[in-house]
């Protein structure tokens, strides 16, 4: 049975960023991911799933060591941002009001994930299990035990469920969740 400090289920933006930041602190990390994204090529069509990454998120990605990788891919600065509710209430932000060249960047989610995955490769204390999925989770007082669908058994002090809104890991741990559906 493999031992680790932290088992992270899901290597999306949240799981991969968390893995990099925890590994930088010297923790022994295992990352379990069912599938990895397609590699980046400049001539690929743009993905529709994008995020508005704030300057604070840029700082986090830089601390995780992934920002330099992202700068080699596609990103677009944004200078103004407006959000609104159904009742018409709107909030507007403008980088000029803050004396900043931009508020942040619009970046394809897949590219953020790829930059973080590339950074994860630099850490000898991160091991990735992919393609793999958790099929059993047992919680103990001092650790949790995970069984992966490839037969791997892991024992971790902490398990982080970063496997999305429909998290199987959260359900296996008996943790409920709630969602708010909003019209887009």
What are the residue ranges of the model-derived segments?
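Long, low-complexity, intrinsically disordered polar/charged segments
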Residues: 1-8, 33, 39-40, 142-148
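N-terminal Rossmann-like FAD-binding beta1-loop-alpha1 element of flavoenzymes
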Residues: 4-31
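Glycine-rich FAD pyrophosphate-binding loop
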Residues: 23-48
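Residue-level detector of anion-binding/catalytic polar loops
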Residues: 28, 67, 127, 176
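Short acidic, glycine/proline-rich loop/turn micro-motifs
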Residues: 41-44, 95-96, 174
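N-terminal FAD cofactor-binding segment of flavoenzymes
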Residues: 45-85
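Conserved N-terminal helical subregion
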Residues: 73-172, 179-184
């Amino acid at each position: 049975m493999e031992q680790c400090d932290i088992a992270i289920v899901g290597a999306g933006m949240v799981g991969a960023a968390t893995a990099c930041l925890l590994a930088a602190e010297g923790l022994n990390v295992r990352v379990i991911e069912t599938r990895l994204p397609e590699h980046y090529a400049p001539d690929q069509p743009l993905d529709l799933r994008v995020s508005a990454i704030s300057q604070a998120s840029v700082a986090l990605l830089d601390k995780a060591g992934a920002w330099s990788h992202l700068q080699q891919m596609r990103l677009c600065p944004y200078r103004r941002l407006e959000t609104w509710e159904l009742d018409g209430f709107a909030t507007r932000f403008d980088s000029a009001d803050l004396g900043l060249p931009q508020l942040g960047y619009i970046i394809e989610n897949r590219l953020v994930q790829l930059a973080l995955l590339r950074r994860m490769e630099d850490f000898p204390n991160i091991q990735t299990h992919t393609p793999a999925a958790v099929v059993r989770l047992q919680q103990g007082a001092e650790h949790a035990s995970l069984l992966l669908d490839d037969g791997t058994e892991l024992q971790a002090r902490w398990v982080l469920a970063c496997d999305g809104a429909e998290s199987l890991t959260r359900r296996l741990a008996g943790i409920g969740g709630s969602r708010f559906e909003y019209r887009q």
